[in-house]
Amino acid sequence: MSSSRPVALVTGANKGIGFAITRDLCRKFSGDVVLAARDEERGQTAVQKLQAEGLSPRFHQLDIDNPQSIRALRDFLLKEYGGLDVLVNNAGIAFKVNDDTPFHIQAEVTMKTNFFGTRDVCKELLPLIKPQGRVVNVSSMVSLRALKNCRLELQQKFRSETITEEELVGLMNKFVEDTKKGVHAEEGWPNSAYGVTKIGVTVLSRILARKLNEQRRGDKILLNACCPGWVRTDMAGPKATKSPEEGAETPVYLALLPPDAEGPHGQFVQDKKVEPW
């Protein structure tokens, strides 16, 4: 028996920006908030931390690299809630700048999670999004920087209003293949594997927003990519300028856009403002 209670889900939520987004949604969202994390133990510890603050998130395991794990979460949401109101795709990985893992392996591993994992979550969970639902894909300003460092022909493809999901997948796979062959620089790619994966997330968001316009126009679902800023997390390190709480502001703003909001939709948003892509 599914409850009609609204529900919000945050992925990669056991620490950093994801944890801060979950905390803020627990305070502001009128419904249940599901904290999803790959590691059950760390996820439960994060839930206990929030419970100690008087908040009551629910936990569900989610490894976005594992299609079975995504489907288990989908089934849970359908059974318990009959759908999903807010989806925040925050889970992602990055290698440290000084990591000596070969670049092609960094490219493959980062792409698998940041782009393909996020895409798989969208594939399974977007059909569950209820009318006036909100979807937020956490991208990065690094994607904009990486875009500007791509060869012009690649930039034009990534900025195209008509690029298809299949074409985008082809380009993401080509980047990984080019790194394996050691030709990514001469093929016009930038030197940031993380940056290219986040170009993928931003462009995927534009494509999915367009699909929602075509297939579910009357449902007023808003889907955006955003940059939380340079945030002090395990990923970005201690020198970053924003706290995780400050990093959560834009994702939470997009997750809680009022029901009558016309936009933003299909945009790249930073500091609550639409950035030109």
UniProtKB/Swiss-Prot annotation:
Positions of glutathione binding: F95, K96, V97, Q106, A193, Y194
Ligand binding (substrate): S140
Catalytic activity, EC: 1.1.1.184, 1.1.1.196, 1.1.1.197, 1.1.1.71
Annotated Gene Ontology cellular component terms: cytoplasm
Cross-referenced CDD domains: carb_red_PTCR-like_SDR_c
UniProt record, GO biological process: glucocorticoid metabolic process; vitamin K metabolic process; xenobiotic metabolic process
Gene Ontology molecular-function annotations: 15-hydroxyprostaglandin dehydrogenase (NADP+) activity; 15-hydroxyprostaglandin-D dehydrogenase (NADP+) activity; carbonyl reductase (NADPH) activity; oxidoreductase activity, acting on the CH-OH group of donors, NAD or NADP as acceptor; prostaglandin E2 9-reductase activity; S-nitrosoglutathione reductase (NADPH) activity
Residues the record lists as N6-1-carboxyethyl lysine modifications: K239
Annotated region (Disordered), positions in chain: 258-277
Active-site residues from the entry: Y194
Transmembrane segments: none
Disruption phenotype: Embryonic lethal.
Catalytic activity: a secondary alcohol + NADP(+) = a ketone + NADPH + H(+); prostaglandin F2alpha + NADP(+) = prostaglandin E2 + NADPH + H(+); prostaglandin E1 + NADP(+) = 15-oxoprostaglandin E1 + NADPH + H(+); menadione + NADPH + H(+) = menadiol + NADP(+)
Family: Belongs to the short-chain dehydrogenases/reductases (SDR) family.
Summary of the function given for this chain in its UniProt record: NADPH-dependent reductase with broad substrate specificity. Catalyzes the reduction of a wide variety of carbonyl compounds including quinones, prostaglandins, menadione, plus various xenobiotics. Catalyzes the reduction of the antitumor anthracyclines doxorubicin and daunorubicin to the cardiotoxic compounds doxorubicinol and daunorubicinol. Can convert prostaglandin E to prostaglandin F2-alpha. Can bind glutathione, which explains its higher affinity for glutathione-conjugated substrates. Catalyzes the reduction of S-nitrosoglutathione.
Identification of the protein by name: Carbonyl reductase [NADPH] 1
Lineage: Eukaryota, Metazoa, Chordata, Craniata, Vertebrata
Gene behind this protein: Cbr1
